[in-house]
Amino acid sequence: MDSNPKTQYGLAKPSISKVPPLPLLTIGQVMMNGAAKYGQMNWRKDPVSSSTYYDAAMRHLMAWWDGQSNDPETGLPHLAHAAANLCILLDAISGPWLMDDRPIAGYTNEFISDNTKKVSTHGDQVPT
């Protein structure tokens, strides 16, 4: 670490330096496409339902998982589309723009915790 006094203050704030830039730029391309189609930051003008963006993100993830790399309409990566939808949800939930229409909370966290195998902390080992 350098000795500049600004560094200490900077390190106390949220950091973006650990996020790789290329995915952010690709998400930006998707967001530009969406702005042209729906209007820039349209979800901040009219509140949006969480299910709309969850469904869209999941459709893009499923298409990617099914072996389709790019969205046929935009030619941009399905993963970037999914990430853009999640970014919109994160932004909308931070303000008054999200209509939270999720179902009543279930037990997903508990199920995952109960069904997660304990593994050693050796980085070169794969859980069995």
Predicted features and spans:
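Intrinsically disordered, low-complexity regulatory regions
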Residues: 1-128
